[in-house]
């Protein structure tokens, strides 16, 4: 079977299976992206989480980081208030940790070129920790990830280590990150639509035109005069995150010019 | 110029340049890995940070997440004690955030196959957020990243929001994560050595042998009888992290068999 047919078969097989997540369905905020991707023959999504605030409990001691002993006290895909956390914390007698986790999306791609397009969209939308995985036999996946998290230990052996005022302050930050994450998801959707439209146009155009067109797309510095580049906003650069390459604290040698 | 010669030229150019990081040199814990990679013709490192505890100050309000207003109050590549943070916090009149950031390493690779080998080594060593980037003209980079972070807001508009006891508790966790990160770096170095040795052996062996050998390497489930697979320890799986695919909270459809 050729690669194209093989991918098609896998996709059909994957999408016909039940959703094995605890929730059992795709998160509301990411449904449009999942549908857009699964509607294209070169992609299918294998896992997704739109972003969430979670309160985890780890065994009896967070210094013994055993995954087996971890349970969830609270999971919310919507903004939370202090009382949600206070109530959930009552169930904890180990070490409770509050986390904000941004969008995570895994997409299987027919070929490397498809993953590259999706990767550009992800980076341009602010998901800077995204990356491609290529398996030994060529299975190509894109993981969409952000650096925009939060991970705060709250209690130790059942004892609350912070004040209620602090939890309130923390949730304001977590909710704000959730909003920012939502904006990025919207940006991702818009960028993706443009990229896929462009892809369709170039696929149908003359081969020479196609090459020319390809070389012009996904410029890091967008030309404000070009409507199709508008998804690359400067907003991305204003948000504080672990932007590794810009970070003066990381040992850096000059990159050769982009090729 | 062919790709091989082009890569060689870029590498020479990159490694001859000064280190533009604030520190001006490669972190001690990652020197061996950097040297091992740069000693191979198919790789060169472009940035690295072994892992660190940092105290950042963000403008006057962490809800206005402007990167421009961010400054560093403390950076440590070694374990910290409470007083280090207390002293540094005295300089803050905005919003201070304590972070633990694990190893970050960017490696430019001659071809995709080289990045795949390095990616396997990274994943097997516990750096699960690692990923490949392929530029429009084929520039291939591997980013080594872990999920093993910590990000805790400590003060708001200059006011400390937590107790000293909490800071002490937090640093125990951060220091523990630093230790775990160090173990993973060692694991990465050992795995990398084995992978590169194997690569050399297979490159020099008969082509048919080479293919056979390649298909046997980097098994997820290692065969305990085989010495060359010993770098894949079960330890990795015990550590609590955002292991996206295992997470029952993430909408998941069945992966087609690895190919």
UniProtKB/Swiss-Prot annotation, chains A, B:
Keyword ATP-binding recorded: no
Keywords: Methyltransferase, S-adenosyl-L-methionine, Transferase, tRNA processing
GO cellular component, one term: cytoplasm
Spans annotated as Disordered: 200-259
InterPro entries, per the entry: tRNA_yW-synthesising (IPR003827), tRNA_yW-synthesising-like_sf (IPR036602)
Catalytic reaction(s) noted: 4-demethyl-7-[(3S)-3-amino-3-carboxypropyl]wyosine(37) in tRNA(Phe) + S-adenosyl-L-methionine = 7-[(3S)-3-amino-3-carboxypropyl]wyosine(37) in tRNA(Phe) + S-adenosyl-L-homocysteine + H(+)
Pathway(s): tRNA modification; wybutosine-tRNA(Phe) biosynthesis
One term of GO molecular function: tRNA methyltransferase activity
Signal sequence coordinates: none
Pfam families: TYW3
EC numbers, comma separated: 2.1.1.282
Keyword Transport: no
EC primary class: transferase
SUPFAM superfamilies noted in UniProt: SSo0622-like
Biased composition (Basic and acidic residues): 200-216, 226-241
GO BP terms in the entry: tRNA methylation; wybutosine biosynthetic process
Its biological purpose: Probable S-adenosyl-L-methionine-dependent methyltransferase that acts as a component of the wybutosine biosynthesis pathway. Wybutosine is a hyper modified guanosine with a tricyclic base found at the 3'-position adjacent to the anticodon of eukaryotic phenylalanine tRNA.
Record PANTHER family: TRNA WYBUTOSINE-SYNTHESIZING PROTEIN 3 (PTHR48418:SF1)
Similarity comment: Belongs to the TYW3 family.
Protein name (Swiss-Prot/TrEMBL): tRNA wybutosine-synthesizing protein 3 homolog
Organism of this sequence: Sus scrofa
High-level lineage: Eukaryota, Metazoa, Chordata, Craniata, Vertebrata
């Amino acid at each position: 079977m050729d690669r194209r047919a093989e991918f098609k078969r896998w996709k059909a097989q994957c999408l016909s299976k039940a959703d094995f997540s605890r929730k059992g369905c795709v998160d509301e905020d990411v449904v449009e992206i999942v549908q857009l991707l699964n509607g294209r023959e070169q992609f299918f999504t294998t896992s997704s989480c739109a972003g969430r605030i979670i309160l985890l409990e780890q065994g009896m001691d967070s210094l013994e980081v055993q995954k087996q002993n971890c349970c969830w006290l609270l999971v919310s895909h919507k903004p939370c208030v202090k009382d949600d956390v206070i109530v959930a914390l009552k169930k904890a007698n180990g070490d409770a940790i509050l986390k904000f986790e941004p969008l995570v999306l895994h997409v299987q791609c027919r070929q490397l070129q498809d993953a590259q397009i999706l990767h550009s969209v992800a980076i341009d939308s602010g998901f800077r920790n995204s990356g491609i995985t290529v398996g030994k036999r060529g299975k190509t996946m894109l993981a969409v990830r952000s650096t925009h998290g939060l991970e705060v230990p709250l209690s130790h052996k059942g004892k609350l280590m912070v004040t209620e005022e602090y939890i309130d302050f923390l949730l304001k930050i977590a909710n704000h990150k959730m909003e920012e994450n939502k904006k990025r998801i919207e940006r991702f959707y818009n960028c993706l639509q443009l990229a896929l439209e462009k892809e369709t146009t170039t696929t149908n155009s003359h081969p020479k035109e196609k090459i020319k067109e390809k070389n012009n797309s996904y410029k890091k510095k967008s030309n404000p005069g070009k409507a199709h580049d508008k998804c690359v906003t400067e907003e991305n650069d204003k948000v504080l995150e672990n932007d590794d390459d810009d970070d003066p604290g990381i040992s850096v040698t000059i990159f050769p010019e982009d090729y």
